C-alpha cells in the first residue's frame, strides 16, 4: 500500500483516508508510524453504525488507546475517546458481531486486538 501511495503521489495529490471506529482507533498510532510523512486524513467517526461506535470501548481499553494518542499528540482522537461514553450493550453486540465474522473468516479478533480478549472470551 505504501509503495502504491508513493507511486501515485508523484503524479497526483493523494492522501490516506480512514474512518474511525471502536476497533481501529487503537491502531491509529501504528498507522501514523507506518505512513510516516505521507498525508493522512483521519476521517470521520462511525456514529450511526452500531456496534462499531466508540461507545463500545470499555474504560480499560479506552485508557490504553488514550495513552497511545497522548504519546503521539493526536488531539482529535483524544477528544473523540474522552467524549465517548461506554455502553456495555453496544460492546456485547460488537463482540458478537466479531465472533460471527471470525467464524466465517477463520480468524480470531484478539490476534489483532489483544486488548479486547477478555471481552471477546466473555461474550
List where the protein language model places each region.
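Radical SAM enzyme [4Fe-4S]-AdoMet core and its adjacent flexible, acidic
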Residues: 1-123
Amino acid at each position: 500500500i505504501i509503495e502504491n501511495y508513493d507511486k501515485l503521489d508523484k503524479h497526483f495529490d493523494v492522501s490516506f483516508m480512514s474512518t474511525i471506529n471502536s476497533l481501529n482507533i487503537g491502531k491509529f498510532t501504528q498507522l501514523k508510524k507506518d505512513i510516516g510523512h505521507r498525508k493522512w486524513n483521519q476521517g470521520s467517526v462511525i456514529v450511526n453504525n452500531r456496534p462499531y461506535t466508540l461507545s463500545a470501548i470499555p474504560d480499560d481499553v479506552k485508557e490504553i488507546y488514550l495513552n497511545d494518542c497522548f504519546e503521539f499528540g493526536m488531539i482529535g482522537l483524544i477528544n473523540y475517546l474522552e467524549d465517548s461514553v461506554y455502553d456495555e450493550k453496544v460492546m456485547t453486540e460488537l463482540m458478537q458481531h466479531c465472533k460471527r465474522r471470525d467464524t466465517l473468516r477463520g480468524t480470531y479478533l484478539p490476534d489483532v486486538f489483544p486488548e479486547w480478549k477478555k471481552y471477546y472470551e466473555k461474550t
